[in-house]
Amino acid sequence: MRILISNDDGIQAEGINALRACLQEQNEIYIVAPDRERSATGHKITMHRPLRVKEWHYPEAKTVGWAVDGTPADCVKLGLEALLPAPPDLVISGINLGPNLGTDVLYSGTVSAAIEGIINGIPAIAVSLASYDYRDFSFSGKLIKELVSAFGNRLPDKTLLNINVPPGKPCGIKVTRLGNRRYINIFDKRTDPRGRVYYWMAGEPFDLDEDDPDTDVWAVKEGYVSITPVHFDLTDYKIMERLKKLLKTAKILNRELKD
């Protein structure tokens, strides 16, 4: 398979290189990744300045790589439309250092890189090691290798798989839904040497449904690998029908609008 790999931790990160090492023997690998840490950039793209690209070489490997001074979404977009010699069969983003659970996916550069794949009709996987302290990516890499070998060509092209691997040896794999994760944020107010005020943001996750066994949050907490199907259609179809009825009742629906 021809696979485009990206991430948000940067092209030199341990996770992306562990993933490359697991996949490069049996697949045609291209890496397009940020030239530095770009975590929590969401789906930001660069429009008001040029993108700088540097070729990245991997000794004793056929992998072709590029480091981009942009976001993860920039990297995948650039790879698909300008750098790769042909469209990839699959986009994989990761292996991220740290979890991407619940509403993390809305902030995550890792997940956004995968979303850019499915926006362009290419199946995608986002994979994260759900720990900042445990840095053994070997199981995560082997799992992705197995998934790609088993059904890489049969993945849906409008839905990505968001995979979170717990630290240590997992006790199993669960197919899950996104949990409801919020953050208790702290903004540390400081003053720079010129007297200007600035803020450092920090925070801890607060999971509203951590006891729900259907969620990715619960699965990882209990030592399972979570696999969550995610798509970019944010439409609330139930509310859509209710809204039509409300507007019709209020005689607003289909009304001719005038200045």
Curated annotation (Swiss-Prot):
It holds the Pfam family SurE. Binds 1 divalent metal cation per subunit. InterPro entries: SurE, SurE-like_Pase/nucleotidase, SurE-like_sf. Its cofactor is a divalent metal cation. It is found in: Cytoplasm. One of its GO terms (molecular function) is 3'-nucleotidase activity. Its EC number is 3.1.3.5. It is an enzyme of class 3 (hydrolase). It catalyses: a ribonucleoside 5'-phosphate + H2O = a ribonucleoside + phosphate. One of its GO terms (cellular component) is cytoplasm. It comes from the Bacteria. Its main location: cytoplasm. Signal peptide: none annotated. Keywords: Cytoplasm, Hydrolase, Metal-binding, Nucleotide-binding. A divalent metal cation binds at residues 8-9, 39, 96. PANTHER family: 5'-NUCLEOTIDASE SURE, 5'_3'-NUCLEOTIDASE SURE. NCBIfam families: PRK00346.1-4, PRK00346.2-2, surE. Nucleotidase that shows phosphatase activity on nucleoside 5'-monophosphates. Belongs to the SurE nucleotidase family. This is 5'-nucleotidase SurE. It comes from Pelotomaculum thermopropionicum (strain DSM 13744 / JCM 10971 / SI). The lineage of its organism: Bacteria, Bacillati, Bacillota, Clostridia, Eubacteriales.
